[in-house]
Amino acid sequence: MTTIKKNVRELAVDVLESVEKNQSYSNLLLNSKIEKHNLSGVDNGLLTEITYGTIQRKMTLDYYLEPFVRDRKHTLSWVYNLLRISLYQMVYLDKVPDHAIIYEAVEIAKKRGHKGISSMVNGVLRNIQRQGVRPLTDIKDETERLAIATSHPQWLVERWIEQYGVEKTSEMCEINLTAPLQTVRVNTRKISRDELVRLLTEEGFAVEKSSIVPEAINCLRGNLVHSESYTLGFMTVQDESSMLVAHALGAVENDMVLDACAAPGGKTTHIAERLTTGQVSAIDLHDHKVKLIKKQAQRLGLRNIKTYVADSRDVQQKFSAEGFDRILIDAPCSGLGVMRRKPDIKYTKSKNDIIKLASIQTELLDAAAPLLKQGGRLVYSTCTVDQEENQRVAEAFLQRHPDFERDLELQERLPEGVQSFVEDNMLQIFPQDLDSDGFFISSFKKKSQ
């Protein structure tokens, strides 16, 4: 094994440690490690695979490790994470033989600990190599088995089964273990999709047109952020489900639009690209996040976005009543629809978090509603699949605001491939539906008096 690969595995342990101890986001930590250590494409891929894979399958790995680790409570966390990443490679990856994985783990243990730790790591992994892991069929309770087999907390599996049934829950849990495609949105102000596909192919990337969203391209090989076309502002990294929001909002030409929870700016810039003389007022609570919106707008060559640092629950203090043609509330949420991109989410969220978020979502909708013109459209969206944050928040909004009604034209504004998922004025996309992020969109019209 080369030194650089050894370092990759040590970095994976570092990331897992920070995720567990500091509640850090794995995706941000990974990007930081990759940049800091100037990893090659191969090592970048290996670090991402080991880190995400171990987090995604943490509960399964712990189930496998339990019979072999005598004193889990007194095992140092970095040692246990080293065992996790090693077992992940032994069970789920086949390019490196077990003896090499064990050797590498022991070397890391020697470097970071003492002889007793390296002996323990060697003993645990060699015992697993000889005996194999216990079968998941030993778990008799079906819900518990599904939870451990797919590494989703049992409370969450039970909640989804109650909301959607066993089959849909099982499908969702299974797909959450897979890696998502990188998808980009073409900046049609600058270039056509066909032309961008040609340029990216010439740069050596493997790409294909999305069959779901007309301005989307899927990346099959490479990272398009490193392309010249990205630097030139020809595209934005954005999931296909997220792109549906701008279609749902349907802002065109000279519309005045409020994006009340705008950072990091993917939907903001998408809306702005579809306008001519109109403008997007983009709000976010944090200054550093508003700077991200400005940075994206500048890269894309968009001058019709005005940014504000503010709490959108106080938005009535900043804007006049009935001043916007379109309002988007892409609300803060539990993020349960994007577990493939942020696998640590499933271990950090709780039932109480969902209750608190639903309350914030309600406040955001209530604050923005008076700012919409009569006949205008309000779109509420989240990247979660939980009914308490989605359908229930949307239904309750209508009950509190008799001056609003369901927007039954939502379906016809969306791309044909997703129209069948619309019910009334709501769209719920599950990760397994289109191999995209889980997403919810609902649309309301303000009645004309």
What is each of the regions a protein language model found here?
Residues 1-449:
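S-adenosylmethionine
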